[in-house]
Amino acid sequence: MDMTWLDLWKFHGAALLAGCVIDWIIGDPLWLPHPVRLMGTMIAGMEQRLRRWTEGTGRKGQSRAGAILAASMCMIWWCIPWAIVHAAELLWPAWAWAALLLAEGFLCSLMLAARGLYTESMKVCRSLEAGRTEEARYNVSMIVGRDTSVLDEGGIARAAVETVAENASDGVIAPFLFMAFLGPAGGTLYKAVNTMDSMVGYKNGRYLYFGRFAARLDDLLNLAPARLTGILMVLGAWVLPGMDGTHACKVFLRDRKRHASPNSAHGEAACAGALHLRLAGDAWYFGTLHKKPYIGDDDRKIEPADIRCANHLMFFAEGLMVLGLAVLIMVL
């Protein structure tokens, strides 16, 4: 299909809007292996091979191996979506527009996690509201990395709120932003980097040098999305009922850098301020207590309903992105 660059961007934008709708309606189908799982399998396999090839080469060898891993994953996952999209066009040439739109829209939906975050976090909310603490503890363990066995009901609710607030950026706004500019390949490239960071981006003896390139690349890619997420959530606090926009703005500006990562606290700070909650703080991971600064003010006791409110902020932020993209497509 012959299209101008503007027409091509509009087409990718329309596919992204379709992907948002698909994600809202069906989320991630359980019967379909998710691309992020495949990314994880590839990262683990490539890590083993690269470590064998660079065994005994020291810090520089580990750093080079990590850079090769990152570059390889980025190239592979940049190409895969375009291959799928063009395969759809070749298989159904008479329906090229529809086939491309459907293929792109479905790929985009797989890169967005709004429905998945909502579904899993609301399991925690409903369990807590029903008084089923052990069930809530199990449900929250499915979406957080910390040790949940030491959490009381308030700690369980807080962990769920933090997860929604933090992942609103790397699970929703960031992939949306990359796909808005670069099509579905932008989303898969971003997710590949984000998955690498979650697997090898640790500052420990095993990954300090091997995972450094992936961790820094992830920090770079999330600079704009994380800050945009915080701003959108502050706007949501001004509009949504039961939230405090003034306090959200205050806490966002004050606490958005209270994290070891330069990008992780922006959404949490806006959410904490909007709900007058204190989030973050010390947490147990694999039997070790990790000291972390608090985010927000301890103005009131956290409640299960705050999980629902955090989801409202996430959907509001995504909704503004959808509205902005739709307006641009119509006026350009």
Where are these regions (language model features)?
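Hydrophobic alpha-helical transmembrane segments
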Residues: 1-189, 193, 201-332
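Glycine-rich phosphate/dinucleotide-binding loop and adjoining beta-alpha-beta core of small-molecule
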Residues: 198
